[in-house]
Amino acid sequence: MATVNQLVRKPRKRKVAKSDVPALQACPQRRGVCTRVYTTTPKKPNSALRKVCRVRLTNGFEVTSYIGGEGHNLQEHSVVLIRGGRVKDLPGVRYHTVRGSLDTSGVQNRKQGRSKYGTKRPKK
């Protein structure tokens, strides 16, 4: 425990919270251009081909972003919107592409949880 005199001489330091999504620079989303679209495999014990893309953001950052949902239309030079949110079994993937905005299409034939995948309400 510090004495009053010690605290007068040198006050307590505030802890600085480190951002989980530094490339967004305190913005909710960022726009970017796909530089590479590919699949990668997750860490043990999971097994799959996860769809990801490398994105050059408008602020100059280059990040890896996960493409959620079944099927996508992204290719090189597609303009995408990026939000925060990591993928636990893919090391280095700390961002998600927003489905249904800019060049990213929504997921086809999706009935539940549509808002998360940019899918319009189906006709009766």
UniProtKB/Swiss-Prot annotation:
- Which intervals of the chain are annotated as region Disordered? 1-22, 99-124
* Xref: PROSITE patterns: RIBOSOMAL_S12 (PS00055)
Keyword rRNA-binding appears in the UniProt entry: yes
Instruction: Return one GO MF term.
Output: structural constituent of ribosome
Query: Which keywords belong to this entry?
Result: Methylation, Ribonucleoprotein, Ribosomal protein, RNA-binding, rRNA-binding, tRNA-binding
Task: Give the compositionally biased regions (Basic residues).
Answer: 111-124
Example GO BP: translation
Q: What does this protein do?
A: With S4 and S5 plays an important role in translational accuracy. Interacts with and stabilizes bases of the 16S rRNA that are involved in tRNA selection in the A site and with the mRNA backbone. Located at the interface of the 30S and 50S subunits, it traverses the body of the 30S subunit contacting proteins on the other side and probably holding the rRNA structure together. The combined cluster of proteins S8, S12 and S17 appears to hold together the shoulder and platform of the 30S subunit.
Q: Which NCBIfam families match?
A: rpsL_bact (TIGR00981)
Q: Which family, according to the similarity comment?
A: Belongs to the universal ribosomal protein uS12 family.
What is the protein named? Small ribosomal subunit protein uS12
This protein's species is Marinomonas sp. (strain MWYL1)
Q: Coding gene? A: rpsL
